[in-house]
Amino acid sequence: MNLDKIFHLKENHTDVKTEIMAGVTSFMTMAYILAVNPNILSAAGMDHGAVFSATAIASFLGTLCMALFANYPFALAPGMGLNAYFAYTVVLGMGYSWQVALAAVLAEGLIFILLSLFNVREAIFNAIPFNLKKAVSVGIGLFIAFIGLQNAKIVIGGSTLVGLFSLKGYNETLAEGLTASMSDAGITVLLAVIGVIITAVLVVKNIKGNILWGILITWGLGVICQFAGLYVPNPDLGFYSLLPDFSNGISIPSLAPIFCKFSLDGVPLLEFAVIIFAFLVVDIFDTIGTLIGVASKADMLDKDGKLPRIKGALMADAIGTTAGAMLGTSTVTTFVESASGVSEGGRTGLTSLTTAVLFLLSLLLSPVFLAIPSFATAPALIVVGFYMVGAVSDIDFKDPGQGIPAFVCIAAMPFFYSISEGISMGVISYVAVNAVTGKAKKISPIMYVLALLFILKYIFM
């Protein structure tokens, strides 16, 4: 096989060794999703092992499409923020089944294929004001970090709606009248806090795969605590053994519990459309923003600041999302962690092909990834939130017409525990504030349509 001819290595001033090493680097920085995504989606009632398999296979397919359709070194996987919206907003917040949420993801993927074919996706993206785009990223970052703090039990419910975990008199009532005491939960909170510190140090030191290493080290400390008797497994209380279960050998968890399990039972058409739209908007921001941002670091943009072959890259994302929904996972999107592979010299689809193969091989290590607890992945959520909140520096808060809608969008996501509410309120407030202050003609017609749809949602839902 002539890899140079397929991926145009010489034309892109790279070689096979550089591309493969870059692909390995991208995988190392993204592999945390194999542990985090099952933990998040299982909160919605989905089978933990099946979600792991779906995550690995969907990541493989999406990244492979990127290599073949666009020849870019970008990798794809179920997106952070989108998985949180799936589990914590659509299912736990709005009360719909995960089968309904999967149906929305499938619909989004099919719509994306059409939008990518007819270049509508770029038009929607361009219609949203720059500051509001950045606000969506910041709001999702806060939302993800908040979920991480909750998963770690650092933030708990209380008389003030949310409160800080207390070492004194801790007592948590679980399902069916079971109660977790300080001796049960205290060690996991401590390990999560240590995990945040360790991951932060790795980020500051710019260690490759810092998020994945943070998860593994935190998990390792938990295993040590289990051997020392400080962490006592008790499945009835939700504290499972931290040791990988190889009793059945190396086996790949079945997709059967979640494969092609779609439902529209009990969901009003307008509300289903809003759910789909929220997936669409966030994925649009995620994908195009990541593509342009990472490509600019690799000098892949043309003289007009546009990315050649972007249609192929967007199509890979759309196909990845559609395939992912059928497999049983949330929206697949291009990962900003692809920048790590680019920084290692990755310039072609051979980098993403390498990453794709590693995602497929990860299926053989399912007992390892499935043994990683939520207190070990919580620091990853918090640090990913930190990365996303960094976009706040790009928002023009000196202009109230831009800053106020951006702030509303940011604040609404964690406070209302919903990404879609943040987008809705951000769009409505932007149109309202600017339309009545003499800037009505500067607002895109698409924004007026979106604002009207969101207002109708609040009136009739």
PLM regions: where:
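Helix-loop-helix junctions within the multi-pass membrane cores of secondary transporters/permeases
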Residues: 2-37, 58, 79-88, 92-140, ...
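Hydrophobic/aromatic residues within the transmembrane alpha-helices of Major Facilitator Superfamily
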Residues: 24-31, 64, 68, 145, ...
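Membrane-embedded alpha-helical modules
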Residues: 94-217, 353-461
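Alpha-helical membrane-protein architecture signal
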Residues: 13, 17, 194, 273-277, ...
